[in-house]
């Protein structure tokens, strides 16, 4: 008889973008239930131990968390396997550091260091807009938030700029041709570009055609696209490379020039 969720995760079955060693042990941290899907998140233990190197062992991570040093989106989190995900702000007040979880062009999570001003907000993609009791409108975001009385102009797939201190919508970006987006799924995950065209297919997925700043065009599904700014200017700072995917030859040339320098 089943007794709830599985509490274990084998290391070989863990998502590739966690970048865990095969020989580092048999098991990996199983993400807790939370705002992000288990295959699209990064547990806090991996952020503190594997990425930031503030701990050497699992036990040290628990000690740091229990001292209430780690905040995600402005709230203290003590769960070692809390699932942090795309666009989340991880803050460490003790060291005056703030990081935003973004993707690199290889589809892996990148902890991008940000300033205090930028850590006060996050961009949330709108999943749906519904009406509750007595006709009260509310919207649902990609990270499980419910916000009542949104602007009537906000529609699904738009992006809202959310003030993390007051939990209020400051501004919003329409999902329109000409706006800058980041791809959050599929083989183009982590790439940044401007929407060029939107193909609608009845009874199937909508296809979005995107062009990056170097002029390369690619296409992906509507569900994989996340608006991050109006026009060509993103509202959040981007990691090194600015979401431009290099070919294998370009990468090799870049490595050679770095070695020679």
Swiss-Prot record:
Which Gene Ontology CC terms are recorded? Answer: cytosolic small ribosomal subunit; mitochondrion; plant-type vacuole
PROSITE patterns, per this entry?
RIBOSOMAL_S4E, S4
Entry's Gene Ontology molecular function annotations: mRNA binding; rRNA binding; structural constituent of ribosome
> Keywords in UniProt for this one?
Cytoplasm, Ribonucleoprotein, Ribosomal protein, RNA-binding, rRNA-binding
Alphabetical list of InterPro entries matching this protein: KOW (IPR005824), Rib_uL2_dom2 (IPR014722), Ribosomal_eS4 (IPR000876), Ribosomal_eS4_C (IPR032277), Ribosomal_eS4_central_region (IPR013845), Ribosomal_eS4_central_sf (IPR038237), Ribosomal_eS4_KOW (IPR041982), Ribosomal_eS4_N (IPR013843)
Q: Which domain of life is it from?
A: Eukaryota
- Enumerate the Pfam families for this protein: 40S_S4_C, KOW, Ribosomal_S4e, RS4NT
Tell whether Cytoplasm is among the UniProt keywords: yes
Q: Which residues form the S4 RNA-binding domain?
A: 42-104
Q: Name one GO biological process term.
A: translation
Q: Which Gene3D superfamilies match?
A: 2.30.30.30, 2.40.50.740, RNA-binding S4 domain
Q: Where is this protein found?
A: Cytoplasm
Q: Which PANTHER family does the entry link to? A: 30S/40S RIBOSOMAL PROTEIN S4, SMALL RIBOSOMAL SUBUNIT PROTEIN ES4
Family label: Belongs to the eukaryotic ribosomal protein eS4 family.
HAMAP family xrefs: Ribosomal_eS4 (MF_00485)
Q: What is this protein called?
A: Small ribosomal subunit protein eS4z
Per the UniProt entry, what species is this protein from, by scientific name?
A: Arabidopsis thaliana
């Amino acid at each position: 008889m089943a007794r709830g969720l599985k509490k274990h995760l084998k290391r070989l079955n863990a998502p590739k973008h966690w970048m865990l060693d095969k020989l580092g042990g048999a098991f990996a941290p199983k993400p807790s239930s939370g705002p992000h899907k288990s295959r699209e998140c990064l547990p806090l233990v991996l952020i503190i131990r594997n990425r930031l190197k503030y701990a050497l062992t699992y036990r040290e991570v628990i000690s740091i968390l229990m001292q209430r040093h780690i905040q995600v989106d402005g709230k203290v989190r003590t769960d070692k396997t809390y699932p942090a995900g795309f666009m989340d702000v991880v803050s460490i007040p003790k060291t005056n550091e703030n990081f935003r979880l973004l993707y690199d062009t290889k589809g892996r999570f990148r902890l991008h260091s940000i300033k205090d001003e930028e850590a006060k907000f996050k961009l949330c993609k709108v999943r749906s807009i519904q009406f509750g009791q007595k006709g009260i409108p509310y919207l649902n975001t990609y990270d499980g938030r419910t916000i009542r009385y949104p602007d009537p102009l906000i529609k699904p797939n738009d992006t809202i700029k959310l003030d993390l201190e007051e939990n209020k919508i400051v501004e919003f970006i329409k999902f329109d041709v000409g706006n800058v987006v980041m791809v959050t799924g599929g083989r183009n995950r982590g790439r940044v570009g401007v929407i060029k065209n939107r193909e609608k297919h009845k009874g199937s997925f909508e296809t979005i055609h995107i062009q990056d700043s170097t002029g390369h065009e690619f296409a992906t599904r509507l569900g994989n696209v996340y608006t991050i700014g109006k026009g060509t200017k993103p509202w959040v700072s981007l990691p090194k490379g600015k979401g431009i995917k290099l070919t294998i030859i370009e990468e090799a040339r870049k490595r050679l020039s770095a070695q020679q320098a």
